[in-house]
Curated annotation (Swiss-Prot):
Residues 1-40 are annotated as: Disordered. GO terms for molecular function: unfolded protein binding. Involved in the assembly of the cytochrome c oxidase complex. Residues 138-194 are mitochondrial intermembrane. Belongs to the COX20 family. It is a multi-pass membrane protein. Keywords: Membrane, Mitochondrion, Mitochondrion inner membrane, Transit peptide, Transmembrane, Transmembrane helix. GO terms for biological process: mitochondrial cytochrome c oxidase assembly; negative regulation of programmed cell death. Signal peptide: none annotated. This is Cytochrome c oxidase assembly protein COX20, mitochondrial. One of its GO terms (cellular component) is mitochondrial inner membrane.
Length: 194
């Protein structure tokens, strides 16, 4: 269902929001043109009715999520979902795995060197794997969230920035300013030779 990243409905590499938007939506038949339309006249968006009914689709999704049960979610799980290729496609999985394995080696090695007990070292290694994976996962997610926020701020800054290339330069005004400057008598220089 919605919480399992490998369900049959999910496509790899496509966020859930995009998949919901790409889901088939009931489209209305072609709308008749407004009564005040004349051939060749441009139609404005405000003159037409919306193509999609956003209220019903949101309520349908809410009803579908309410009906989701653990049994329905379990039916979507397959053995292929646990392949290394699919797991490597999950964002932050690699970083979490590397941090977990590093923590496992460090915790297991230090415990083994200190206590000389392989069972105890293995237990601490597994604990280090779990804890390191969680820390690596959360750290990667935080970095991704921050980078997405920076990218969004950059997008907003570029959108709000004035685009000088859209204005045509007024060459006549510039030429007039240059000619006026050349017509003025030369000013007395600020320096003086003696």
């Amino acid at each position: 269902m919605a919480w399992w990243p490998f369900s049959r409905n999910n496509k790899p590499g496509v966020p859930e929001q995009d998949q919901v938007a790409a889901a088939p939506v009931q489209q209305r038949p072609a709308e008749p043109l407004p009564t005040n339309y004349t051939p060749g006249q441009r139609l404005l968006l405000e003159d037409t009715r919306p193509r999609f009914d956003t209220q019903s689709s949101a309520s349908q999704q809410a009803v579908q999520r309410e009906r989701a049960t653990l049994a329905d979610a379990w039916k979507t799980v397959r053995w292929e979902d646990f392949s290394l290729e699919r797991m490597a496609g999950i964002p932050c999985f690699r970083d979490a795995g590397m941090a977990g394995f590093s923590a496992m080696v460090v915790a297991g090695s230090v415990t083994f060197l200190f206590h000389k007990n392989p069972v105890r070292a293995a237990n601490w290694g597994v604990g280090g794997l779990l804890l390191g994976s969680i820390v690596g996962w959360e750290q990667c997610r935080m970095q991704r969230r921050r980078s997405f926020q920076v990218a969004e701020m950059a997008r907003q800054t570029v959108a709000a920035k004035e685009a000088p290339m859209l204005r045509k330069p007024d060459n006549a005004q510039k030429a007039g300013a240059v000619s006026q400057a050349s017509e003025l008598p030369p000013k007395k220089p600020w320096y003086r030779f003696w």
